[in-house]
């Protein structure tokens, strides 16, 4: 599907480029203090709005920065190839434990609740099936203390009411979806989504395979927490609803046509085999939504989110289905599996016209660190419904069943690190040891960079805790490359 291009877009793009030329060399502090006219001193990302036209986030699972990027890391492609191409932000932090709350935070600024911190598992969850819940968050009202809890919603449950906005809704207002195809300026790509449509999740059959906007029945059980091996008629399904933050908002799932058009399966890669001639690996062959969207800058979404399956994101060490290169079972996942995913899918992004033109930033990070790391940064405060974002007391009985020590109450999700790739604005091979950022900082940065400067919790384009006073978005320590004329790579 082609993305909707509003009339006059080309003129706006020219103006944005001229603006970038004028301000790229303007002085700024190391921590992004660019201030727009009329912004009342709000701290914004160091680059001008519109300088980065496309942002893609690849979300991996459950590793500390010291393990991922340290000596002896099994992520050899990440460290040996990608880190030299971009900037490693060492002090990047998750905002909670376990998974779901971090996915939600990065697109909405909503803080962990007891339920989202527990991945919507309950104290009586059967550890053999890991069946969770997909329940509305009730009562779902704005917290009365908006000074302390900006944009935060009170309640218990997992699915936010329709008035709670995400960066997807913000982009819909800024750049309305195509009125015929409903394709928007954002897209969420989920590997394996709908591989086994019978009994795991509900959705609309996608013409390219899988299901669109796939999630459990509202207020019903969630059967996707554990991967499902292949059957006689269906491939393995390693999609986990809890790793798809977009389907936890009624503002997205209630608009069926738009959700179907934009919450889509990632697609497939056929890994190139060694050449019979000289043994060099032949090119990979891709199919599906992502490769189709990347063919032109005007079909590439402004904001793209990529969630690998439970093996390829590193969550599962022993995999019920194949990783990117076809390995199954013990050792197929973990950082090794995540690294194989990056080794094949990141080159696809980097080969896209949008990236080669210097218009795209790629962010590779992790939802959370290991459960023993509950550190936080950036003045993170808990939300109104969970005083300890680093651990939900709903999980205590499960820890006891497993014979594991119950973690101490913690304030965050640990130091996970992030790698940012941008051929125009980031110096290859650089390491940021001074900046401190978290998932809320990232959301604030995405909003600023993509031109979302109105609305939101603060009226200046920032949602939830991304609007927290004093929160720092990506600054000159991140966008550290001196401006130069950029040519097609």
Each language-model region and where it sits:
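N-terminal pro-sequences and low-complexity stem/linker regions of secreted or lumenal proteins
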Residues: 30-489
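Secretory targeting and sorting signals
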Residues: 2-31
């Amino acid at each position: 599907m082609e993305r909707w291009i509003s009339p006059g877009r080309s003129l706006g793009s020219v103006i944005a480029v001229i603006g970038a030329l004028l301000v790229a060399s303007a002085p700024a502090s190391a921590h992004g203090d660019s201030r727009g006219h009329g912004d009342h001193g709000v701290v914004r990302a160091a680059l001008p709005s519109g300088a980065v036209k496309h942002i893609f986030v690849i979300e991996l699972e459950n590793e500390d920065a010291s393990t991922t990027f340290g000596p002896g890391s099994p992520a050899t492609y990440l460290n040996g190839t990608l880190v030299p191409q971009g900037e490693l932000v060492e002090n990047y932090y998750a905002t909670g434990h376990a998974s779901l709350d971090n996915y939600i935070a990065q697109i909405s600024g909503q803080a962990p609740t007891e339920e989202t911190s527990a991945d919507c598992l309950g104290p009586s969850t059967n550890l053999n099936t890991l069946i969770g819940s997909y329940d509305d968050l009730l009562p779902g009202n704005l917290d009365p203390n908006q000074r302390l809890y900006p944009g935060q919603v009170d309640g218990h449950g997992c699915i936010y009411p329709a008035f709670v906005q995400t960066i997807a809704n913000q982009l819909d207002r800024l750049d309305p979806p195509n009125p015929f195809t409903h394709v928007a300026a954002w897209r969420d790509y989920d590997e394996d989504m709908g591989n086994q449509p019978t009994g795991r999740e509900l959705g609309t059959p996608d013409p390219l395979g899988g299901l669109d906007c796939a999630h459990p029945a509202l207020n019903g059980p969630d059967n996707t927490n554990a991967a499902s091996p292949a059957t006689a008629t269906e491939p393995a399904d390693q999609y986990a609803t809890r790793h798809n933050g977009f389907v936890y908002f009624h503002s997205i799932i209630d608009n069926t046509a738009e959700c179907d058009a934009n919450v889509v399966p990632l697609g497939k890669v056929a890994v190139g085999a060694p050449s019979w001639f000289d043994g060099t690996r032949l090119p990979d062959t891709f199919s599906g939504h992502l490769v189709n969207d990347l063919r032109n800058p005007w079909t590439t979404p402004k904001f793209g989110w990529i969630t690998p399956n439970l093996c390829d994101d590193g969550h599962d060490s022993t995999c019920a289905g194949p990783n990117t290169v076809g390995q199954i079972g013990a050792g197929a996942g973990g950082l090794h599996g995540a690294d194989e995913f990056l080794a094949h899918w990141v080159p696809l992004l980097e080969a896209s016209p949008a990236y080669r033109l210097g218009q795209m930033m790629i962010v590779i990070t992790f939802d959370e660190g290991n459960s023993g790391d509950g550190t936080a940064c950036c003045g993170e405060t808990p939300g109104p419904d969970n005083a300890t974002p680093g651990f939900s007391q709903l999980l205590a009985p499960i820890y006891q069943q497993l014979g594991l020590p119950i973690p101490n109450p913690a304030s965050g999700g640990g130091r996970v690190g992030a790698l940012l790739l941008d051929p125009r604005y980031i110096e290859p091979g650089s390491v940021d040891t001074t900046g401190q950022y978290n998932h809320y900082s990232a959301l604030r940065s995405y909003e600023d960079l993509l031109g979302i400067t109105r609305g939101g919790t603060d009226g200046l384009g920032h949602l939830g805790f991304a609007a927290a006073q004093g929160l720092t978005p990506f600054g000159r320590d991140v966008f550290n490359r001196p401006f130069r004329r950029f040519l097609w790579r």
